[in-house]
């Protein structure tokens, strides 16, 4: 049975860097929310052991793609825990709509969707907690997509607390460049000393992103894009960029601004949602009978 699964984007509604550990990892406080917009991943299970990504992503080798790595990770894990049913493969297509290096979590979301989808198709029966624990080896943001609810994250991003931010409309804009998270986090000028605060205090304060001033300084196109969007709405960087987003009270007001955007701007309008579209989709598909 073939299904097309959503692979939603995320926003960092705020992002504060509170320190750096001896091992180089950054400690942070951030608020994640999903968007009702993202990539789409179509999966057809195979009865052999082959994983085939039939729509390669430009610039990413097949075996290094997080989609393929997630599928093989689940294969390997199920091999150890479900002898006799793990020898299944998949043909995978992706309709890639999210920009790479945009701060929208596209690669992590793809990995999480594959873990959840193949857990369903292969009937491996793992819990979301198990899948999230597997996913963290693929990327720090994978667990938030697996668990499927807006969350406040602490530590290096691994400590998650369910959150219920307001579900606003957003205009998300991309400047047409890719920004490496590693490049931003290793920059000596990155702000790393924001005081740790309780969530209640953070929710009452203006939402900010500690990476924003540095990224605006290093990338002229981000500076240009954010300056334009700030003329219309409260706006900021998501993650380490390159995407920025503006907050709107309605879809119509967001689309009105998008319709008058300069030609060089790439953007879309989406609503922030606290329940992941991936989990909403999963709850609506039929339960497979054991084979």
Curated annotation (Swiss-Prot):
Active site, UniProt feature: 10, 141
EC number: 2.7.1.148
Catalytic activity: 4-CDP-2-C-methyl-D-erythritol + ATP = 4-CDP-2-C-methyl-D-erythritol 2-phosphate + ADP + H(+)
UniProt feature coiled coil, ranges: none
InterPro entries associated with the record: GHMP_kinase_C_dom, GHMP_kinase_C_sf, GHMP_kinase_N_dom, IspE, Ribosomal_Su5_D2-typ_SF, Ribsml_uS5_D2-typ_fold_subgr
Entry keywords, A to Z: ATP-binding, Isoprene biosynthesis, Kinase, Nucleotide-binding, Transferase
Any one Gene Ontology molecular-function term assigned to this protein's record: 4-(cytidine 5'-diphospho)-2-C-methyl-D-erythritol kinase activity
Enzyme class, first EC level, given as a word: transferase
Gene Ontology biological process terms from the UniProt entry: isopentenyl diphosphate biosynthetic process, methylerythritol 4-phosphate pathway; terpenoid biosynthetic process
Binding site for ATP: 99-109
Tagged with keyword Lipid biosynthesis: no
Pathway: Isoprenoid biosynthesis; isopentenyl diphosphate biosynthesis via DXP pathway; isopentenyl diphosphate from 1-deoxy-D-xylulose 5-phosphate: step 3/6
The protein's role, per its UniProt record: Catalyzes the phosphorylation of the position 2 hydroxy group of 4-diphosphocytidyl-2C-methyl-D-erythritol.
NCBIfam families: ispE
Self-association and partners: Homodimer.
Family membership noted in the UniProt record: Belongs to the GHMP kinase family. IspE subfamily.
Protein's UniProt name: 4-diphosphocytidyl-2-C-methyl-D-erythritol kinase
Organism field: Photorhabdus laumondii subsp. laumondii (strain DSM 15139 / CIP 105565 / TT01) (Photorhabdus luminescens subsp. laumondii)
Originating gene: ispE
């Amino acid at each position: 049975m073939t299904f097309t699964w959503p692979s939603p984007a995320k926003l960092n509604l705020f992002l504060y860097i509170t320190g750096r550990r001896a091992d180089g990892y950054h400690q942070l406080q951030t608020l994640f929310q999903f968007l009702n917009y993202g990539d789409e991943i179509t999966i057809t299970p195979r009865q052999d052991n082959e994983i085939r990504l039939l729509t390669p992503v430009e610039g990413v080798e097949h075996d290094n793609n997080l989609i393929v790595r997630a599928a093989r990770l689940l294969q390997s894990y199920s091999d150890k825990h479900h002898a006799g049913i793990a020898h299944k493969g998949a043909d995978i297509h992706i309709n890639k709509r999210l920009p790479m290096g945009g701060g929208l979590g596209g690669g992590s979301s793809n990995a999480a969707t594959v873990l959840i989808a193949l857990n369903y198709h292969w009937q491996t029966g793992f819990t979301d907690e198990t899948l999230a624990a597997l996913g963290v080896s693929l990327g720090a943001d994978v667990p938030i997509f697996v668990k499927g609810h807006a969350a406040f994250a602490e530590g290096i991003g691994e400590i998650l607390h369910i959150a219920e931010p307001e579900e606003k409309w957003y205009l998300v804009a991309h400047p047409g460049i890719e920004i490496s998270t590693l490049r931003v986090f290793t920059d000596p000028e990155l702000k790393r000393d924001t005081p740790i605060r309780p969530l209640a205090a953070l929710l009452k304060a203006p939402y900010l992103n500690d990476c924003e001033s540095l990224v605006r300084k290093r990338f002229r196109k981000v500076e240009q894009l954010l300056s334009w969007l700030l003329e219309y709405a409260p706006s900021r960087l998501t993650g380490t960029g390159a995407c920025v987003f503006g907050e709107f009270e309605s879809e119509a007001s967001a689309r009105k601004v998008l319709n008058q955007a300069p030609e060089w701007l790439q953007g879309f309008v989406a609503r922030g949602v606290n329940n992941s579209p991936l989990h909403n989709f999963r709850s609506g598909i039929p339960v497979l009978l054991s084979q």
